[in-house]
Amino acid sequence: MARQLISAIRFIHSFGYSHGDLKAKNVLVRSEGGVISLYITDFGLVHKFMRDEVHAPYTPGKLCLHRGTLPFISEDSHVGAIPSRRSDLENMGWLLIASLFGGVLPWSKLSGKSPVLRAKQSAKQMISSREDTVLKKMMPGQSHKRLFLYMIAVVELEYEDEPDYDSLEKIFEVDV
């Protein structure tokens, strides 16, 4: 399902839009004939990050400040920058931890936007330093390993970067 979610996000991004509020309520799953299909809904916080093939600049501000569902929004959204491709993919990582992989986000019981932002920044710094202990604490069993590789790729993205969606999808391929 992670691969389908990346594919759906890629489709949205291909039109120059970011979703800005990925959460479990905004991801519908349908099973028919043994085939699982995933759909992203609720485009109320969608943003146009690309106009005439020019990416919006990274400009923190009040326009988009903390918009979205607090436990899942990206650092970009916390500081008020227009959500970009990187933002949606970070958002997806937190969503996967809490929803698909049955983990617990360290900031889920924090109140206030600033403490949540600081906790996310700390987690991202540990991921960037290749310390997987932060994800081990969030997630049961071995499921953190693939997500750790995914989150490394995401935290290494610059605001305007176009992600390598194929590589991100391959992280979640099931070994046969």
Regions inferred by a protein language model and the residue ranges of each:
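Conserved hydrophobic alpha-helix
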Residues: 5-12
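Catalytic-loop of the protein kinase fold
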Residues: 13-31
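Conserved C-lobe activation region of Hanks-type protein kinase-like domains
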Residues: 32, 75-140
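Conserved C-terminal C-lobe helix
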Residues: 141-153
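Activation segment/activation loop of eukaryotic-type protein kinase catalytic domains
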Residues: 30-67
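Activation segment signature within eukaryotic-like protein kinase domains
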Residues: 1-2
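Terminal C-lobe "cap" of eukaryotic-type protein kinase domains
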Residues: 155-176
